[in-house]
């Protein structure tokens, strides 16, 4: 194992364990620095053990590089690997074929598209939808129509490199206050997957929020209703209560319009809450279990969401990302 692989694997496990993103980035940046050196420079620093003389390499990352350079597994990587927990999910986890909600550094993710897709492929995914944010969410560097067009070109160029993993085009589009979607319809027409989520005015009154969400899930472009309550139950962003809405009306609209309800796997979200997950199941909704990953290691969060689906006795055939890619895309194209 070389230093670049070791550093990226450490970043992966730290992301998976929800360590401070700034500290994780130190390992990802160090991997980029070492990867950017030519062979002669690597040999020179390796023989002199002078890795820390490189700008951006600190004592912790230098130790990892030196240990990997010597041909041994770095102590930190061995420790992280040994401590990695089984995130659950059982048979349904094995049946999942992909992830329909994840972010790259084109919006507020921490890693390039290539690294996210390489990790997805290593996890055995058959497909992944890249769903960076839409323009109204400026705090997350949401993609304008022009930037989204450029991203689609980049994805086209990457498809052959990552085959047989299928990279699906997508977006996490904001549901605006009136229930419309925050992207040009012609751009939404070009995408494989549209996840629609509320990110603003989360505390509006129940009747208005219900109208807003029903209009969004009835939109023919919407495939998945993302993190429906918007709640946060833990984490460095603090606690945020659930939005108030008529869940029966919203989930009935999802069923009638063929929109999946997302089971968001992020530990700080656990959205929808258990009572609403049971309600959506009983109403007859289909579901999408997604990571909402903003870093490579978070792509393994699927186990959290799958365990919740198992606990709620959601039938596997009603989870859209257990379906083959062609079946999934036929479904997204049918509504």
What residues fall within each predicted segment?
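Short beta-strand segments at enzyme active-site cores
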Residues: 128-132, 167-170, 226-227
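Ser/Thr-glycine-rich phosphate-binding loops at phosphate-binding pockets of nucleotides
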Residues: 100-106, 127-133
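Short acidic (Asp/Glu) and glycine-rich catalytic loops that position anionic groups and cofactors
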Residues: 7-9, 130-135, 284-287
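Charged catalytic cores and adjacent phosphate/nucleic-acid-binding surfaces used
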Residues: 39, 51-52, 63-65, 70, ...
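Active-site beta-strand->loop->alpha-helix modules in alpha/beta enzyme cores, enriched
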Residues: 172-174
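Long, highly charged, low-complexity intrinsically disordered interaction regions
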Residues: 1-91
